[in-house]
Regions:
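Positively charged n-region of N-terminal signal peptides that target proteins for export
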Residues: 1-7
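Bacterial N-terminal signal peptides
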Residues: 7-17
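Sequence context surrounding c-type heme c attachment/ligation sites in exported
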Residues: 41-94, 124-182
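Sterically constrained small-residue positions within well-ordered secondary structures
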Residues: 12, 36-38, 51, 72, ...
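Primarily the internal scaffold of c-type cytochrome electron-transfer domains
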Residues: 22-40, 88-124, 174-175, 179-182
Length: 182
């Protein structure tokens, strides 16, 4: 005879498996028409990772400084942006227009309301500092893709459980449920 606890766990497992099977198709990043066909959501300021991280070779952790010590990655403070763009005005009219938005936000003391791109369900914890410690700066690219080549950042990985587990298996780290679900 099955205990009540075992029955509940079995029901949850079967429900999760059914949901997973329903949404098991390959992830396709959305294409946003109002940003010239670029993938990903339109942000309040068109931040060019391909210029900052690619052309200018600014390391991820220069702007995302708290990622190595905090559980949440954190969006860079406007102070980080204005630190450079107080002096750097942009090389093209479109870049100058976006930098003007940064300067205006700084002057008005109103940081942009960025749209989150890489979101996990509320029941999943992804402590960035642990991943940075284990994988070094390669951890950024492994999950976020080659942002140095992205004019606009978009989600390249599914960030679904199977994708995460395969990385844990490959790197021979714990697959205990409580590592990510607590």
């Amino acid at each position: 005879m099955m205990t009540k606890t075992l029955a509940v766990w079995l029901c949850l497992a079967l429900s999760a498996a059914a949901l997973s099977a329903q949404s098991a198709g390959r992830y396709q990043a959305p294409v946003v028409s109002d940003t010239g066909g670029l993938k990903g959501p339109r942000q309040p300021i068109f931040f060019r990772h391909d210029i900052h991280a690619g052309q200018d070779q600014i390391p991820c952790m220069y702007c995302h400084a708290t990622v190595a010590v905090a559980s949440e990655p954190g969006i860079p403070a406007l102070q980080t942006c204005i630190g450079c763009h107080q002096l750097i005005g942009g090389s093209t009219p479109s870049h100058q227009g976006e930098i003007k938005k940064v300067r205006d936000a700084w002057r008005e003391r109103k940081p942009p309301e960025w749209i989150r791109i890489h979101a996990l369900p509320g029941f999943v914890r992804f402590p960035h500092q642990r991943h940075i410690k284990a994988l070094g700066t390669q951890a950024c690219t492994r999950c976020h893709g080659d942002v140095q080549k992205m004019p606009q950042v978009y989600q390249v990985s599914t960030l679904r459980m199977g994708w995460c587990v395969s990385c844990h298996v490959q790197n021979k780290v714990s697959r205990d449920c409580t590592v990510c679900h607590y």
